[in-house]
Amino acid sequence: MTRKLEIPESRDLPDWSHIGGGKVRELYVHRQYKNILLMFASNRVSAFDFVLEPEIPEKGRMLTQMSNWWFRKLPAENHLLENYDQELYRDLASHIPSHILERSTICRKMDIIPFEFVIRGYLTGSAWADYLENNTVYGIKLKGKFRQGDRLPGPIFTPTTKSRTKDTPVRYEDLVNAIGLSHAQQLREMCTDYYTTAEQIARNKGLIIADAKFEFGIAEGKAYLADELLTADSARYWDINSWGQFDLPIERRLDSFDKQAVRDWVKCNSGKNITPQNITPLRLPQELIQTVYKKYKTLLAKLTG
């Protein structure tokens, strides 16, 4: 079955050339300023590296607002053009229709480091599965006994490959071999600092960031935060009050403001193996679409309100 991808009409972006896209975003380069990119966030939703249907209403706009909010909150150099040349940013933005601009990020072109950098502050997801099986979190031995959802003694840095299909964990030693010791150390420190700062900001908003993915680009020999930042697609958020109520069932304590409900539904409806043949025919029920939409909307309001 062929899926029709949501891509802005060329007449709406006459100054930009479409150069590719991923599971959620479409990428454009400016026809005159070849070092300026536009990332358009679609309403598509993916799980286990597959795009599903139907789309989540307003998802692209909400993700863009979350990401831009965090880019402005964190004391970190990033890829946003407005931080580099406000006059050029305002000029380019003024020629983009509002319904596209609200879902777009205008940024500097950079050499993206081909890894994703995940910081885990709480024992959940694949970290919890690893702990149950090996009593470690990605090779790190934990002292004492931990429950699902417990806060870890300190943030754990777990890089992965950056792939169009399935991302796989990367040992720190292999990361060092790929990008060099100094760069690996710098990125680990940056990710840990950004996560720690963001987690405190989120706590003040009544939220916990259980884990988060960061991506970086290189320009003029420096590393900058790139792609999306701490959105509902790239970070796992919990309600801080629910997390602290240990008498609640675990699914309520750790109910997250993201697409975990989609992942759970796919697991239940794709048979024993999650494969393209099993996932492609699936259509998400409207009740689930509305549930995820409300989660994104609630998270955005909690963060920015």
Swiss-Prot record:
It comes from Tropheryma whipplei (strain TW08/27). GO terms for biological process: 'de novo' IMP biosynthetic process. Its EC number is 6.3.2.6. CDD domains: SAICAR_synt_Sc. The gene is purC. GO terms for molecular function: ATP binding; phosphoribosylaminoimidazolesuccinocarboxamide synthase activity. SUPFAM superfamilies: SAICAR synthase-like (SSF56104). NCBIfam families: PRK13961.1 (NF010568). Belongs to the SAICAR synthetase family. This is Phosphoribosylaminoimidazole-succinocarboxamide synthase. HAMAP family: SAICAR_synth. One of its GO terms (cellular component) is cytoplasm. It is an enzyme of class 6 (ligase).
